[in-house]
Structure formats: structure tokens, C-alpha cells
Regions:
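Channel- or pocket-lining gating/hinge segments that regulate access to a cavity or pore
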Residues: 176-178
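Beta-strand-loop-alpha-helix segment that lines the small-molecule cofactor/substrate pocket
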Residues: 173
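Feature captures the catalytic cores and cofactor-binding loops of soluble hydro-lyases/lyases
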Residues: 1-166, 180-213, 217-235
Length: 235
């Protein structure tokens, strides 16, 4: 992904990106039920690397499974590429942790761009102080083995009622996380860029006392001309 496109998304709000996706017909791209652990560093951008959990079966998910160097969760932590965002499919179930501070720290040190789960993290009081964006539903102390069985990595998953394919673009801010399908990243970026500029313009006008009628949305011809004149000066 080109730096120019990255800059567009990193400067845009998740709300703006959601609207740009809706204009394309994609209305279910905002991951439901999650929020950032540390809102001071919640801006997040990266391609998706995924882990899929299924309900744990007691005879197959004993504590000893972590001794296997090929355990999917452990492999994922070591293979998630630099700048990618790890996304866990925990079936919206926070009764057991998707990961804890040691694994999240490892991903931070390896240079991952963030960690997202529709479940919960254990050691959340430690994770919120790490220098990596993290999003979850709520804290959860029990180990993942009690409820979640890691079954596959880097496959299509569901996270918070949103389909996430490997290499989809994951963008997060203080409100939450949106998923931009890989095949429309460039196309959506054009609308996101325009909307960000336009919304900044509108906010400045409204702060100075302007009415939103004819301005937001831009339906008044006089307001259109004013915006176009302002836009030409910016470029």
C-alpha cells in the first residue's frame, strides 16, 4: 500500500471511513462491541492478519497444548508481519481471554500495528500501558484455553459481526475499528480524502455560526460555489 493512501486513512476518522464505505454499498464494516484500551494511542492502521477461535473442547484444549510449538495462537503471534494488525475471531465471547500481556508485548516488540478482538484481553491493566493500539470488548482473566480453541490462522474470519479477510485494511481510532475490504482500499481512499477535506471545511463554517442547511449535505448552489472556491485555494 502506497504511503499516500496510508496518509489518507490515518488522517481520517473511522466515522468518515464508515460513511465512505456506505456510499459504496458497504454498510456493515464497523466492528461491533469493542473499544480501545488506551485512547491516547488508539490511532491504528494496518493490513489484517487473522486468528480463528472455535468453542473449546475440553479433551483437546488442555493446558499442555501450549507446549506444542505449532499451536496456532503461538504461531500467529510469531508470524504476524510487521505493521499488520492481528485480528482475533473470538465469536464475540469475552468470558475467556483472546490473549494476554505477554503475547501482546511480543507483537508490539515485533512491530505489529495493533491487536483487535471481539472478546477480551487478560492483563488488560498492563496492556493498556503498552505502546501498541489494542481493542477489545472487556477485560477477561480466564485463559483462552477454557473457552477458545485456536484452530486456524490468516483465514477469513468474523470479528464483531464483520467479515475480515487477510490483508483487508484495519483502521482504528478512539471510537472503534472499521474494516476496508482489500479490493476497494484505493477506491475508497479517494472518497475518504474528499470527505475529510469537506467535513473540516464544514466544521470551520459551523463554528463561525453557519447553518447546516444547504451546507451539510452540500445542496445549496451558493454554498457549492464557496466550497469550490475555497478548495481551489487549498490546492
Amino acid at each position: 500500500m502506497k504511503n499516500e493512501i496510508k496518509d489518507i486513512y490515518i488522517k481520517a476518522s473511522v466515522a468518515t471511513i464508515c460513511t465512505a464505505l456506505f456510499k459504496k454499498g458497504l454498510k456493515n464494516q464497523f466492528i461491533q462491541g469493542i473499544s480501545p484500551l488506551n485512547k491516547k494511542i488508539s490511532k491504528m492502521l494496518g493490513l489484517a492478519f487473522t486468528v480463528r477461535y472455535i468453542p473449546a473442547r475440553e479433551d483437546l484444549n488442555l493446558i499442555d497444548v501450549f507446549k506444542d510449538p505449532n499451536h496456532p495462537q503461538r504461531v500467529a503471534v510469531e508470524e504476524c508481519p510487521k505493521d499488520y494488525v492481528m485480528v482475533f475471531d473470538s465469536r464475540k465471547n469475552p468470558r475467556a481471554a483472546s490473549a494476554g500481556s505477554i503475547l501482546v508485548t511480543r507483537m508490539m516488540v515485533r512491530g505489529c500495528g495493533g491487536v483487535v478482538t471481539d472478546g477480551g484481553f487478560r492483563d488488560s491493566h498492563e496492556i493498556k500501558n503498552l505502546n501498541i493500539p489494542t481493542y477489545h470488548n472487556r477485560p477477561s482473566s480466564p485463559t483462552n484455553l477454557t473457552l477458545h480453541q485456536a484452530i486456524d490462522i490468516n483465514v477469513p474470519i468474523g470479528c464483531g459481526d464483520v467479515a475480515v479477510w487477510p490483508n483487508d485494511l484495519i483502521v482504528g481510532d478512539q471510537e472503534g475499528v472499521v474494516v476496508v475490504p482489500n479490493n476497494v482500499i484505493k477506491e475508497i481512499s479517494k472518497e475518504v480524502k474528499f470527505m475529510t477535506i469537506y467535513e473540516d471545511y464544514v466544521l470551520k463554517k459551523v463554528n463561525k455560526g453557519s447553518s447546516i442547511k444547504g451546507l451539510y449535505p452540500l445542496t445549496n448552489e451558493d454554498e457549492k460555489n464557496k466550497f469550490e472556491a475555497w478548495l481551489s485555494k487549498q490546492s
